[in-house]
Amino acid sequence: PDTSLSAGEIENYFATYVIEQSAVDLGGIRNTVTVTGRSPNSSTNDISDISDDGDDDDGNTENDPTDIPITRSPALTVNKTAAVVEGSGNSITDLGDTINYTITVQNTGNVTLTGVTIVDDLENADGDNLTLTSGPDWSIADNGSSEGTLKVGETATYYASYLIEASGSDSGSIVNTAIITASSPVGTNDTTASSSVTTTTTEDPSIVVVKTYNIIENGVSGTNPNDIVQYQIAVTNTGNVTLSSINYVDTFTNRESI
């Protein structure tokens, strides 16, 4: 470049900078130029000036850096899916099956997110709390970040599971909600998102009754008057839901009326 400058002359210089993520995270770019020169009667660089930003209305009329503000927009998206693994030996979703949950969390903003945490709420259709069998456990981030950090555009995957118990199947459905919270350069825990998925269970109520007896003899061999007949009634819930208001009606007749 030309290193001389005539009186009244303006020389333009150009420089470029590719915006890096660290600059976005900090909210802007600050640039200052210092120009030095030598006057005709000097053997050293005796003239210098620090650049101004060209804005005399900002409260600083001299030697102020040129600032380029960058708007920081933290954001998250969460997606949750559920897949049922048959465990009860039938073709319906019910007691004994396992629900496997996959939760993906993506940084859809323009700043790095840290302190990423997940809270996974599990309830039945009545609003009663249920307990996950496992998870939620962090698995991987697709751009190499460790657990708790998400680069811009990066997606992390979590897994959880629930073995369906009576408290889950009796109500007719199971609702799972993942709530993600993260911190951005703008603030602590300032970025949240959530996603829910509902799994419907199928009721298949049934009952089996088996009645057996035992004769207690009164001292005389064989079945005779005054012997005692002791009945045992076994009632088995062979369905997949809890049964209530069980009622017993025992009809007793002699053989001639059978």
Model-derived features with residue positions:
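Exported/extracytosolic protein signature
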Residues: 1-258
